[in-house]
Amino acid sequence: MTDAAARETELKFLVDPGAAGALFDALPPGTDKAARTLVSTYFDTDDQALRRAGFSLRLREGVQTVKSLAPLEGVFGRGEWEAPAAGDAPDPDFVAGTPAGAFLGEAAPSPRFRIQVSRRVRLVERGGASIEAALDQGAVEAGAHGGGLCELELELRSGPTAALFDLARDLARIAPMTLAFASKADRGFALLDGLAPAPRAPAPAPVLTEAMSAGAAFQ
């Protein structure tokens, strides 16, 4: 049974594909992982019981993951439960052992949409913190609907949260970035509903000063 959630603290930004490479190259020196293609399949019941309860269920590269769609604490922390998976469908016992299991009843989740991205990852140290930066570029496919995706994600692996905001503030000087509150799962469900938003350009780069705190920079 999966009882405890790993809490993710992360910032996600929508970025212009044309500026994505420059943003990644502007990251502090660190350890780069080999670029790879990730294919994720998201599951739910016909009546979207998991989505309505605030969860997503994903299968990717032999790992099954339940995530809370709404933050557990504050704005940037989400709950996550994961375990190895065998085959092309999540294990019912795994799902039952997470908070999402209480909302399924006898219904069996089935594939709803698919997300494929090319991912570049760099592990960096900043202000006493270890941060994983991931650049995802790809597409969401939901039935007859689809849409492009270009995100830069900064995840705090350890250390003070302020360092995460400081790094994001520095990157915002390189190119415009729009803070993304919607998860990849949210985008997939929106496409499934035929409610995909029109492409949105990132907000203009904010005016930042050295004296400005990280919190003030994101207001």
Feature-to-residue mapping (PLM):
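Phosphate-end processing signature that detects enzymes handling 5′-triphosphorylated RNA
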Residues: 1-219
